[in-house]
From Swiss-Prot:
EC number: 2.1.3.15
Function: Component of the acetyl coenzyme A carboxylase (ACC) complex. First, biotin carboxylase catalyzes the carboxylation of biotin on its carrier protein (BCCP) and then the CO(2) group is transferred by the carboxyltransferase to acetyl-CoA to form malonyl-CoA.
Domain of life: Bacteria
Keywords for this protein: ATP-binding, Cytoplasm, Fatty acid biosynthesis, Fatty acid metabolism, Lipid biosynthesis, Lipid metabolism, Nucleotide-binding, Transferase
A biological process from GO: fatty acid biosynthetic process
GO CC annotation terms, alphabetical: acetyl-CoA carboxylase complex
Taxonomic lineage: Bacteria, Pseudomonadati, Pseudomonadota, Betaproteobacteria, Burkholderiales
The name this protein goes by in its record: Acetyl-coenzyme A carboxylase carboxyl transferase subunit alpha
Location within or outside the cell: Cytoplasm
CoA carboxyltransferase C-terminal domain span: 40-293
Record note on quaternary structure: Acetyl-CoA carboxylase is a heterohexamer composed of biotin carboxyl carrier protein (AccB), biotin carboxylase (AccC) and two subunits each of ACCase subunit alpha (AccA) and ACCase subunit beta (AccD).
PANTHER family registered for this protein in UniProt: ACETYL-COENZYME A CARBOXYLASE CARBOXYL TRANSFERASE SUBUNIT ALPHA, ACETYL-COENZYME A CARBOXYLASE CARBOXYL TRANSFERASE SUBUNIT ALPHA, CHLOROPLASTIC
A molecular function GO annotation: acetyl-CoA carboxylase activity
Length: 323
């Protein structure tokens, strides 16, 4: 699959294009230009390292939305075995922006739930671009309750711009569905391990992200609103999205500094989409280490740990500033 380059990666794109041209020439002739190819490849790698070491929050947002970034079904295929998808909320419909089902992780039975955006136009429409309606969240809630019944851990993968804001979603009580999911996650008697793999957009993300362990990929985002949405409200124009991204503090490093997540999962150089194998290996270790935290932990201890975690959010200290 040919890599899609973002606007700020155009220098890398030009180098990679030259490398491809040289490889074609070498394949079609007897001329040995392997040294030139090696030199350009090293230059491209170093340039990628330099650019990705200094990404702005707005650039991180673009990487988090990259169309070739691994989605939930990619992680399901790369990390889990015996996946059996379960459908529907048993109330209204099967929202395909959220997928979920029974699986095994390192031979251990588990439940997997996550957003799915879609790769092409047809699938994106089917998945509603990863923006869930109430029936999607109710499906997730049903699967969480099923995991509790079977006493198996829950793995969630978050990648959504936010909950769908359409009239039909509001008619079916979108806010209640999200709020109910938060309630259920707070009292669920099995471990929940949540990972932000792309966009973590507002309540639409939080509805399946209230984990006992919360991970974030290095170039993912987690925020109450998108940069464009924030800019449209504050400055009446989406052109200020870059400035809004700076103010929102949506990067993994910023969220970790606030104590809202537990660990940042490293991505391959150039983003998760550049090397699926490396990304899967990094993710497998992060999930495995997280799951070991709950080995032998009793339900009461699990719930106490979770409630302490939730109650620690939003604490502040008053200080007196001398004039």
């Amino acid at each position: 699959m040919k890599t899609t380059f973002l606007d700020f990666e155009q220098q890398i794109a030009e180098l990679e294009s030259k490398i491809e041209e040289l490889r074609f020439v070498q394949d079609e002739s007897s001329v040995d230009i392997s040294d030139e190819i090696k030199t350009l490849s090293e230059k491209s790698l170093q340039l990628t390292k330099d650019i990705y070491a200094n990404l702005t929050p707005w650039q991180v947002s673009q990487v988090a939305r990259h169309p070739q970034r691994p989605y939930t079904l990619d992680y399901v295929g790369g990390l889990f075995t015996d996946f059996h998808e379960l459908h529907g909320d048993r109330t209204f419909a099967d929202d395909q922006s959220i997928i979920g089902g029974l699986a095994r992780f390192d031979s251990q039975p588990c439940m997997v739930i996550g957003h799915q955006k879609g790769r092409d136009t047809k699938e994106r429409a089917l998945r509603n671009f990863g923006m869930s309606r109430p029936e999607g969240y109710r499906k997730a809630m049903r699967l969480m309750r099923l995991a509790e019944k079977f006493s198996i851990p829950v793995f969630t993968f978050v990648d959504t711009p936010g909950a769908f804001p359409g009239i039909d979603a509001e008619e079916r009580n979108q806010s209640e569905a999200i709020g109910r999911n938060l309630y259920v996650q707070a009292e669920l008697t099995v471990p929940i391990i949540a990972t932000i793999i792309g966009e973590g957009g507002s309540g639409g993300a939080l509805a399946i992200a209230m984990g006992d362990v919360v991970l974030m990929l290095q170039n993912s985002t987690y925020s109450v609103i998108s940069p464009e949405g924030c800019a449209s409200i504050l400055w009446k124009t989406a052109d200020k999205a870059s400035e809004a991204a700076e103010q929102l503090g949506l990067t993994a490093q910023r969220i970790k500094a606030l104590g809202l997540i537990d660990k940042i999962v490293a991505e391959p150089i150039g983003g998760a989409h550049r090397d699926y194998d490396v990304m899967m290996a990094n993710m497998r270790k992060a999930l495995s280490d997280s799951l070991k935290t709950f080995d032998g932990m009793k339900e009461d201890a699990l719930l106490e740990r979770r409630h302490e975690r939730l109650m620690s959010y939003g604490k502040f200290k008053e200080i007196t500033v001398k004039a």
